[in-house]
């Protein structure tokens, strides 16, 4: 294929020249030209151009037959979905898929319509439109169960589970994952789908059960599965969550050895692995400052990733509370500004954390709003004076009771 840029006019000319009498070689050349143009448009981030292409070659779909046309449309759509997305690109991708689904529906291309809808569910997850993804996923799952299209059902159920997880509905997430597992056990599932099932299983075990050992095993299976088919992107994601499990198991000292193995070494420079390693290093050093720095510098990987965020928030809170407890321990009253300065934070979040500790009864004390100080109460039963006072009160009570009894007898 020539390196000269392809034009829409050239594609349309080639398509119009093809008819039922065209040879297989001519049809194949036309297909290659269409895909080359779609790839070119994707590099130019021209999703609108791809949508125009899809519409302008509709006559060609009838010429090549349903199965071949379906594959061609899906390939063109995939090129469009590789475009890096801002808000505009996100909307354009969704519109492109919806338009293709409408065409498939109106032309009774049911298999194509279902496969495109499944891809749209995955796109909704990618662009964080979880409510829309869950709605479409549930509708499509019902249809696929009736048709017993198990492979597509596995794919849709996994995406449906992801939607529910991101919407904090763990019950629905587990139900959808169970559907995917049941389908994969009763029918052949591709390595890609089996790895996806393992990955989502690890996510839910870590989020709900807090069973990080089992989660690690699932993530490792997913890592191996994705690695075996050369899916480096998803394999990196699985490795990232393996490291997260080691952090949650308080086994961060094992991470360097794990990352030095032959199968893992190629992934070490990935931004996702660099980010989770920064969090692991901060946790190992018990440094709240470094932990907060890691979250700030790697916001996309550690804060916007729901799987990590569920656990990093708990880790951050635990580390912050330990730091505050360590600072205030020697004092009966201490300035908020001093606590904030020592732990490397500003006063407002420090005050908020202390207020939460007081409400959770993790700290016996109060915040003096006038003096901007924290007053720490002595622990009940912690002083000898308090114990002696209780003993004295008990003895006095006995004396009063005896005196009262004697008074009644005298009367």
From Swiss-Prot:
The keyword Transmembrane helix does not apply. It comes from the Eukaryota. GO terms for cellular component: proteasome regulatory particle, lid subcomplex. One of its GO terms (biological process) is ubiquitin-dependent protein catabolic process. PROSITE patterns: PCI. Disulfide bonds: none annotated. The keyword Hydrolase does not apply. Keywords: Proteasome. It holds the Pfam family PCI. Residues 212-381 form the PCI domain. Component of the lid subcomplex of the 26S proteasome, a multiprotein complex involved in the ATP-dependent degradation of ubiquitinated proteins. In the complex, rpn-6.2 is required for proteasome assembly. Component of the lid subcomplex of the 19S proteasome regulatory particle complex (also named PA700 complex). The 26S proteasome consists of a 20S proteasome core and two 19S regulatory subunits. Belongs to the proteasome subunit S9 family. This is Probable 26S proteasome regulatory subunit rpn-6.2. It comes from Caenorhabditis briggsae.
């Amino acid at each position: 294929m020539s390196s000269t840029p392809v034009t829409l006019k050239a594609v349309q000319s080639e398509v119009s020249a093809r008819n039922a009498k065209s040879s297989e070689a001519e049809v194949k050349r036309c297909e290659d030209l269409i895909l080359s143009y779609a790839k070119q448009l994707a590099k130019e981030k021209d999703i609108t151009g791809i949508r125009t292409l899809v519409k302008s070659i509709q006559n060609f779909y009838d010429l090549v037959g349903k199965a071949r046309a379906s594959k061609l449309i899906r390939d063109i759509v995939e090129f469009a979905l590789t475009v890096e997305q801002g808000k505009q690109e996100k909307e354009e991708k969704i519109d492109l898929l919806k338009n293709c689904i409408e065409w498939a529906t109106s032309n009774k291309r049911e298999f194509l319509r279902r496969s495109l809808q499944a891809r749209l569910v995955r796109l909704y997850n990618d662009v964080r439109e979880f409510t829309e993804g869950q709605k479409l996923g549930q509708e499509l799952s019902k249809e696929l169960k009736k048709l017993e299209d198990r492979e597509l059902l596995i794919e849709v159920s996994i995406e449906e589970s992801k939607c529910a997880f991101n919407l904090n509905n763990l019950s629905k997430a587990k139900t959808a994952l169970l559907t995917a597992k049941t389908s994969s056990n009763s029918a052949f599932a591709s390595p890609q789908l089996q790895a996806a099932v393992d990955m989502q299983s690890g996510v839910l075990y870590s989020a709900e059960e807090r069973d990080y050992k089992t989660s690690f095993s699932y993530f490792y299976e997913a890592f191996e599965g994705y690695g075996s088919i050369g899916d480096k992107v998803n394999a990196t994601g699985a490795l990232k969550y393996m490291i997260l499990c080691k952090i949650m198991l308080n086994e961060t000292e094992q991470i360097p050895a794990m990352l030095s193995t032959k199968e893992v070494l190629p992934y070490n420079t990935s931004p996702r692995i660099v980010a989770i390693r920064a969090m692991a290093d901060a946790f190992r050093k018990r440094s709240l400052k470094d932990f907060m720095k890691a979250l700030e510098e790697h916001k996309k990987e550690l804060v916007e990733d729901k799987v990590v965020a569920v656990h990093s928030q708990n880790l951050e809170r635990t580390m912050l509370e330990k730091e505050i407890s360590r600072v205030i321990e020697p004092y009966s009253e201490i300035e908020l500004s001093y606590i904030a300065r020592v732990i490397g934070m500003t006063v407002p979040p420090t005050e908020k954390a202390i207020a939460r500790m007081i409400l959770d009864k993790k700290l016996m004390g109060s915040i003096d709003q006038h003096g901007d100080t924290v007053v720490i109460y002595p622990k009940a039963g912690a002083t000898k004076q308090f114990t002696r006072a209780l003993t004295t009160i008990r003895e006095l009570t006995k004396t009063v009771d005896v005196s009262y009894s004697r008074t009644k007898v005298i009367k």
